[in-house]
Structure formats: C-alpha cells, structure tokens
Regions:
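Acidic, contiguous segments within the catalytic cores of piggyBac-derived transposases
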Residues: 1-129
Length: 129
C-alpha cells in the first residue's frame, strides 16, 4: 500500500507573469502555486500541477478539484493508496471519490465545513482501556 500526501507549495517569484499568486498567509507572499502529491516515506514528488489564476484573480481550479485531479493518477495506475491531506483539501466529495476507488483518506475535519452533512463526534477517553 502507498501512503501519499497532497498539499500545496508556493515557489517564491517576483517577476511579471500572470501565473503569480498572492498568498498573504505564506512566508513568501508572491510566487507560483503548485498542488503537489508526494510519497510520505521517500518525499519523492509523484504528480504536481501549476495553479492558474483567472481574469478576476480567482483560481480556475478549486482545491477540491485539484485534489481529485491528483488522486486520479493513482486510480489509473491501480495503486492501493492512503491519502493524507490538511484542512483545505478535506471534503465529502473527496471522501466519496476515495471510497469509490477503494482507497483510504485521512484528513482534518472542521465542524463548520460539513454543515449539510452530519458527522459522528465521539469523545476519546485518554488513558482508559
């Protein structure tokens, strides 16, 4: 089984190019935004793509579509996979896509993100058997 992490990275650049994105919460504010899929154990990049910015400054590919696009690579190669994502990529649509292709999906779930769907919340008792 393969363990894959999906995340984004901003490669710093201050040139004049329509692909440069402004991210105020990143250490480098301006640069090229890449969505990257890499192996958790080796750190080798398996798949990536450059995010494009539309005319109005919004991304043409949403985070959910970006993650689905990266996940399709492992589905076509028939790899049993566990995907690890951060809070920006976790959604019901991606969970259903992973389930349909018999893959595992681990991500951080925020309570306000899943308002139309109900999730079971269980309190974990620490230190009890």
């Amino acid at each position: 089984m393969t363990h894959i992490c999906i995340d984004e990275t901003l490669i710093s650049c201050r040139n004049r190019c329509h692909l440069i994105i402004y991210e105020p919460n990143k250490p480098h504010k301006y640069g090229f935004l890449f969505r990257i899929m890499c192996d958790c154990y080796t750190g080798i990049i398996l798949n990536f793509f450059l995010c494009d910015v539309g005319i109005n400054g919004a991304e043409t590919v949403t985070m959910v579509n970006a993650c689905a696009k990266l996940m399709e690579w492992s589905f076509h190669n028939d790899i049993r996979t566990t995907f690890y994502t951060d809070r920006g990529y976790t959604s019901i649509a991606l969970l259903q896509l992973a389930l349909k292709n018999k893959c595992n999906f681990i991500g951080t779930a925020q309570a306000n993100r899943f308002q139309e769907n109900t999730l079971k919340w269980e309190q974990v008792d620490r230190g009890k058997d």
